[in-house]
Amino acid sequence: MIFHVVTRQNWQKALQQGFYEADSLASEGFIHTSKANQVAGVLERYYPQHALLKGPCDLVLLHIDEIKLTAPLKFDMATSVNETFPHIYGRLNIDAVVKVEKL
């Protein structure tokens, strides 16, 4: 299982389109995702407002079954934190998302 943080609005748009494309797909060539043990760090580094809210916010966590992905999945080193992260090199097919968790 891999994970991706997204706004509810962007996830709703993906459901209407039938696929999900993060902005990073156009700018970097992939969609950023995380392993379970990396989610908290991602939230702290990239969504500090979430940590401050201590309550419901506009973010959801997608639980993605990597076996169901139709786009390639690769693990790349993020030198800024010295960890490898899973990256989806293409659109995220909606049926690969097995759970949507409110943050």
Where do the protein language model's features map onto the residues?
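Conserved, structured core segments of small domains
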Residues: 1-103
